[in-house]
UniProtKB/Swiss-Prot annotation:
GO terms for biological process: photorespiration; reductive pentose-phosphate cycle. The gene is rbcL. Its EC number is 4.1.1.39. This is Ribulose bisphosphate carboxylase large chain. SUPFAM superfamilies: RuBisCo, C-terminal domain, RuBisCO, large subunit, small (N-terminal) domain. The basic functional RuBisCO is composed of a large chain homodimer in a 'head-to-tail' conformation. In form I RuBisCO this homodimer is arranged in a barrel-like tetramer with the small subunits forming a tetrameric 'cap' on each end of the 'barrel'. The modification N6,N6,N6-trimethyllysine is found at residue 4. The modification N6-carboxylysine is found at residue 191.
Length: 465
């Protein structure tokens, strides 16, 4: 046969519309915007090639192996409604292309060099189907939803949190004081801001000590289990682990990590440590909008959320639908359910391109955070349901009477909404009424209602289908 040098069309090798996908394949849905003049089949095949075994020219060493078991295949192409120059390319990757238990390796292949590819104007990974065989190579979340509820002894309602503000500039002792006041007032958790690591005005060890003191004092006074997400994110993995170890020595229930800026390798390491040592792991998604906000390029957040469930985390920030940060309702609900449910049906109206079976990998609690306050409580309770964490930063600390009354207001609002829902009332329609009724017997809630009655963050969402 001989070796035929030269450049040949990708579609001859990598576009295979007759391919039957295997249960073990990783499936990807890409939104492709080709350069003018590049046909869809060629662009789709190019994506499959560049993210698997292909290179730009025929190489002699192809003859030393069979590409068939290893190549990515573009097996289906469909137009995007309302967009002339875009289409969705479906690509199947054989399982053997990926290292077991490594989100890092999976992303290096699937969203690696191919995103800088010249024949494409833009490329966005919309969804991934992770096969059972690959899911089973991951530990996943350190504990999951049920274990967390059992550790905290809190059932039948969403959990309440609060990010301590001002996020930068407080001394450790004043920071601990704010933590204590919020927990004492009735919150379940307080949170280090994602940018709080170990800065000159507050070194991590001092913060950990004062926060631990705040946790134990508020626990003793309320009889409830309390937690503060101690941010273990650091400049090196060794420093990160040092912080996690110190948190364990203090006996606190939960630590935190910024998984995108910290990286998947660091995150998976920390998740393994957390399972071995009984720590819950709260995950913040700082940097996600750099990757997921553009509609035609990058990666959708639902893919980042799936990756986090594999890498490991017990809480993941997932937008709010009602606050100050991006999130269309149906789409947000799609990636609220993805991390926490065992089985998610394909549903294009929610942006879900594939049915995903998580085969008993523990679930992750979605966290609603960003510009929310007591008036949003009915909507949040209805949209997110019991298995969620609702975080009010400014919505707690901005209370006119102080932090503890701010916490009281949120807890009263939540308990009122949960009770109303359990009595069969419609939170979507009667939400404001429920909050008003509750505020009659809670002066703290009444004051909060007064402060935030006019606040709205109304901009059209970017994340549309």
């Amino acid at each position: 046969v001989g070796f035929k040098a030269g450049v040949k069309d990708y579609k001859l090798t990598y576009y295979t519309p007759e391919y039957e996908t295997k249960d073990t394949d990783i499936l990807a849905a890409f939104r492709v915007t080709p350069q003018p003049g590049v046909p869809p089949e060629e662009a789709g095949a190019a994506v499959a090639a560049e993210s698997s075994t292909g290179t730009w020219t025929t190489v002699w060493t192809d003859g030393l192996t069979s590409l068939d078991p290893y190549k990515g295949r573009c097996y289906h192409i469909e137009p995007v409604a309302g967009e002339e120059s875009q289409f969705i390319a479906y690509v199947a990757y054989p399982l053997d292309l990926f290292e077991e238990g490594s989100v890092t390796n999976m992303f290096t292949s699937i969203v690696g060099n191919v995103f800088g590819f010249k024949a494409l104007r833009a490329l966005r990974l919309e969804d991934l189907r992770i096969p059972t065989a690959y899911v089973k190579t991951f530990q996943g979340p350190p504990h999951g939803i049920q274990v967390e509820r059992d550790k905290l002894n809190k059932y039948g309602r969403p959990l309440l949190g609060c990010t301590i503000k001002p996020k930068l500039g407080l001394s450790a002792k004043n920071y601990g004081r704010a933590v204590y006041e919020c927990l004492r007032g009735g919150l379940d958790f307080t949170k280090d801001d994602e940018n709080v690591n170990s800065q000159p005005f507050m070194r991590w060890r001092d913060r950990f000590l004062f926060c631990a003191e705040a946790i134990y004092k508020s626990q003793a006074e309320t009889g409830e289990i309390k937690g503060h997400y101690l941010n273990a994110t650091a400049g090196t993995c060794e420093d990160m682990m040092k912080r996690a170890v110190f948190a364990r020595e203090l006996g606190v229930p939960i630590v935190m990590h910024d998984y995108l800026t910290g990286g998947f390798t660091a995150n998976t390491t920390l998740a393994h440590y957390c399972r071995d040592n009984g720590l819950l792991l709260h995950i913040h998604r700082a940097m996600h909008a750099v990757i997921d906000r553009q509609k035609n390029h990058g990666m959708h957040f639902r893919v980042l959320a799936k990756a986090l469930r594999m890498s490991g985390g017990d809480h993941i920030h997932a937008g709010t639908v009602v606050g100050k940060l991006e999130g269309e309702r149906e789409i947000t609900l799609g990636f609220v359910d993805l991390p926490r449910d065992d089985f998610i049906e394909k549903d294009r109206s929610r942006g879900i391109y594939f049915t995903q079976d998580w085969v008993s990998l523990p679930g992750v609690l979605p966290v609603a955070s960003g510009g929310i306050h007591v008036w949003h409580m009915p909507a949040l309770t209805e949209i997110f349901g019991d298995d969620s964490v609702l975080q009010f930063g400014g919505g707690t600390l901005g209370h006119p009477w102080g932090n503890a009354p701010g916490a009281v207001a949120n807890r009263v609002a939540l308990e009122a909404c949960v009770q109303a829902r359990n009595e069969g009332r419609d939170l979507a329609r009667e939400g404001n009424e429920i909050i008003r009724e509750a505020s009659k017997w809670s002066p703290e809630l009444a004051a909060a209602c007064e402060v935030w009655k006019e606040i709205k963050f109304e901009f059209p969402a970017m994340d549309t289908l």
